[in-house]
Amino acid sequence: MLKGIAASAGVSVAKVYKLETPKVVIEKKAGVAQEEVKKFEDALEKTKKDIEGVKERAAKRLSDEELAVFDAHLMMAGDPELAGQIKAMIENDGVNAEYATEQVANQMVEMFESMDNDYFRERAADIKDVTFRLKCNLLGLTIPDLTSIAEDSIIVAHDLTPSDTAQLNEFVKGFATEIGGKTSHSAIMANSLEIPAVVGCPGVCDACKTGDTLALDALDGVVEINPDEETIAKYEAKAAAYLKEKEELKVLKNEKSVTTDGHEVELAGNIGGFKDVEGVLTNGGEGVGLFRTEFLYMDSDHFPTEDEQFEAYKQVLEGMQGKKVVVRTLDIGGDKHLSYYEFPQEMNPFLGYRAIRLCLKETDIFKTQLRALCRASVYGRLCIMFPMIATIKEFRDAKAIFEEVKAELIAEGVAVSDSIEVGMMVEIPAAAVLADQFAKYADFFSIGTNDLIQYSMAADRMSEHVSYLYQPYNPSVLRLVANTIKGAHEHGKWVGMCGAMAGEPHAVPILLGLGLDEFSMSATQILKARKVVKSLSYEEMQGLAQECLNKDTADEVLETVKTKLGE
């Protein structure tokens, strides 16, 4: 039995398909510069087409948010800096294209991996993925086609790239990898595809071969190779129980999210575009609590025009059939960059020029988005929120631009809804502390816990060295959440939460007790959260929440919740 990290829930038993990637051996050879440059350019063009092909196939199954990784790969393949350095080495050193590609790629990977910045460290993985495909094309090597798998299989690999994961078809019943974590691209995609996955499982590759039987328990993060009949029966029973629970949850699709003592909350979904709307509705979502509009920009090679954005927003609003849609205005910067916009070099871009800070400076970009949103507002129930608000002046300035745009459109004779709600993200501790003041001006709050926790604990959640400090259940974080809700309710304003915490089964009881009005999460989490809500007493959870606020540590909070739930 091998232990790993349960990254995408499920249990399955099937034959092993061991992913053997081509062994790339690069030799340094002298080459005729003109011929080698031509060979490189041809291979680069093929690489771009390969990535576009993978993205096109993946688009049938993945959301816009998950597809964004392929845009990053295409951006990398089209990066003139990368191509320029490789060509320069071919021409100046008289070496073959394969050797130049490997040398330049290694230098760039080493440089990015050494940077104290999440965005650039992630780019190192993109460079590896793209240049591996490029080197295979240069050498005439074939990358395994996972779409050709035609019998029930569990993939075992050192790692799965986004390109690999995007190719997984209905015959793939799960995968186990040596490395990776819950937030890796492959884990996120597996969740979206509802494929069981255990990652970070050292030794799994050496322990099995293609054709072995493998039991994959992605509920507890366990892998067993060639189990006996009794053990197989145990896992099959566990798989059946898990699937039965999923089926039972479906009956909750059209039910209200109401506690045992009659307190109702709203469970909504997070989306990256229109393609995600169906998932929210299928899973009984009562609205969209977060529409990440940055993917409209990241999927384009130019700033989307007003008309392009209008069509995208209209499509989502109509698709949600009158249910509330909360749109976050452009949240770019930090770890999200655009190929056609040059961001300033900053030591810490997560605390720098991003989101509303960029929009208040680049008002033309901001106004274009707001015009498109206002025009689309007549097609549904629209709420607009500004990200990364730190001061009341920022919110007032952003709201003033919205009012200006709205007035201009009305003067032009364009129909605009008179019931658009304008709110803000609470993801900076300063905003949470001053929530009662912000509530005088904002129509609603949406708490972005992913950033709020990072900024509160001064801990990069992607850094393995300090990830232990990323504590959603830390009493200090809970007090910021409580203060935000209290400040809003004092002024009759509602509060949502769109960070990962909103869908955590152990967090829901606390948040319910604190008075959170809207829980927005991945569509696949909605029904499970509804089951939790319907099993709880609001009055009892209020007592639990107060108890948790007075604990000393995150572990004590979690233990208190588990005890209350009888776990």
Residue ranges of model-derived segments:
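Conserved alpha/beta-domain cores
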Residues: 246-567
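Non-catalytic, soluble scaffold/interaction modules
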Residues: 1-302, 308-319, 325-332, 362, ...
